[in-house]
């Protein structure tokens, strides 16, 4: 993650598995294994969330995300309607802002923050009008996460199935 932390950017960067080698990320096989396990356990996973959306054809989007340092903020938004399950694993730096949750699309509706703890994961199932959230960096370095989304299958968006 040292190389990723030092990339100079003012825009959000998503590094998909096919691009890992370009960024010196040695995690392709592990990403494939994780996606395979998620895919084989879709029913068990979605059964844990009673109001989970579902589509006939599902796939997994996987990427490493680089969020620029201060003053970048990703606006308050709800999860895309094509996503049924979302997972964000906090990687680097040691301290940062986690995922902020809201009851509406405004700062006054702030409820709680999923605390940033490296190597911990925040998981949720998006529900229209309910799962408002945002993220940002409060540091002078990039915020690095590993993201997985079970979603309606779209060949240009889904890494798995291959």
Predicted segments with their positions:
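A structural signal for well-ordered alpha-helical segments within the folded catalytic domains
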Residues: 32, 36, 40, 85, ...
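A structural signal for short, well-ordered beta-strand segments
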Residues: 62-64, 87-89, 146-150
């Amino acid at each position: 993650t040292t190389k990723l932390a030092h990339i100079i950017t003012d825009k959000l960067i998503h590094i998909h598995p096919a691009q890992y080698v370009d960024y010196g990320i040695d995690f392709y096989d592990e990403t494939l294994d994780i996606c395979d396990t998620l895919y084989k356990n879709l029913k068990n996973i979605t059964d844990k969330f009673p109001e989970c959306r579902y589509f006939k054809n599902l796939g997994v989007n996987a990427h490493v995300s680089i969020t620029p340092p201060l003053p970048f903020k990703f606006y308050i938004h709800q999860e895309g309607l094509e996503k049924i399950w979302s997972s964000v694993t906090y990687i680097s730096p040691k301290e940062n802002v986690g995922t902020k949750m809201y009851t509406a699309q405004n700062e006054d509706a702030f409820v709680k923050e999923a605390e940033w703890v490296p190597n911990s994961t925040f998981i949720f199932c998006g529900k229209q009008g309910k799962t408002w959230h945002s993220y940002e960096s409060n540091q002078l370095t990039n915020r690095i996460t590993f993201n997985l989304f079970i979603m309606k299958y779209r060949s240009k968006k889904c890494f798995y199935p291959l």
